Amino acid sequence: MHLDHEILNSVDVPKLRADLLTWFQSHGRHFPWRNTRDLYKILIAEKLVQQTAVREYVVEVYTALAERYPNPTALSSANEQDLAQRLSGLGLNYRASELKRLALSIVEKFEGVVPTDLTALQSLPGVGPYSARAVLSIGLGKNYGVVDTNVARILFRVLGIKEKMPSNPARNRQLLAIMDSLVPTGSEREFNLGLIDLGALVCLPKQPHCNTCPIALHCKYFASLPCS
């Protein structure tokens, strides 16, 4: 796949940003990990929702973990069997050792403080580009675009990309570069969350709700539809 920044020239980027941010203000989803700037808690949430549809029980498990293990030091000394039991309702009991290993690494390598550097954060076990960028963008407002399959789908549709989507868009440098260019300074958190929510609620893999999409007028996929 070959993409470059010129692909954005056909899009009114400032207007697209404004339309998405306006929509997010009234339609964005509400989760407790979005109400904190604690990088550790945001990181834990990202690990929980990685392979799990966000639903009420995820919120319950996250809340319980955040209260029982409020920092990396507490999680690093957790009883692994107890931790697995707390995760079993999500089918994530196998992640108990992974979470504990992550916490131990933060304690041993970074004195118990989640690093604020992208490369350092990605050096932690189980932390890839998506999680690292999400944590720093949502927690600190750093200018990183967040790309998962849902966000990549939006980019492909809006920009009219005809090539096959990469199997792991979160690691695709071209998509990451495009997203980094799209993210507005000062609204990094809201823009990334807005695209994530748009992909979950509106720009669905099948039968997307184009008629209610806030950025439909910027979208080449929408423009190609017979009744658009």
Regions found by a protein language model. Give the residues of each.
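Catalytic cores of DNA base-excision repair glycosylases
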Residues: H2-S10, H27-C227
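Onset of an N-terminal alpha helix
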Residues: V13-L21
